Amino acid sequence: PGVSIHTGATGAMHTLLVTTQGELYAAGSNEFGQCGLGALATCVPFQLVPMTERVVDVACGRAASVVVTESGAVYTMGSSEDGMLGTCAASWHHTGPSDVTYDLARHPVRIPNLDGIVRVTCGERHVAALDRDGYMYVWGHASLARLGCGTQSDQPFPVRIPQFVRKNKQDRIRDVVAGTTCTMCVDNQERLWIAGTWRLKAVSYTHLRAHETSLH
């Protein structure tokens, strides 16, 4: 009672909510530590996730979560599979002849050298983030060219998209969203840029490129 929600996000089986006071709450499956509560038990009802500063944005992937704080710092928790945590390459150990278990971050871990972030979005297996200057960063699973950084190799650390590093702020990014197998963003001239595969098309853009769709 008395808690007002500012924003939230859902993954495959978990949910994060941010209050207007900047507190972070989590609920749902915590099998991979994606709720950031330490233990891996299912989290029901919502529980407060301890953070050292106010939270302003969140995003959820299939087995990982991303949190942005008021200062622009980014924290991740959950499975290291696909490099989703942005802090290390996917690391695992064998638990059987054909079974692999990926290392987990059970509490929020800050991504080093990534500052000034104001917006974050997750696909099922990749992440895109936007900083206050309009620069865009991506990391995680790269198949089908969904990252838009010119490679289909997974990126375990944030990569800045070079084509938006421009002096003219009108050519920088205003908003970004990650889909299951694509990433889309809008620049300050209201142009739509797309990378990856979408609408079940067999075409993939390895770099973010302007699309003919009008936003007006």
Residue ranges and their predicted role:
Residues 207, 214-216:
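Single conserved hydrophobic/aromatic residue that forms the stacking wall/gate
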Residues 1-209:
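Eukaryote-biased RCC1-like beta-propeller repeat architecture
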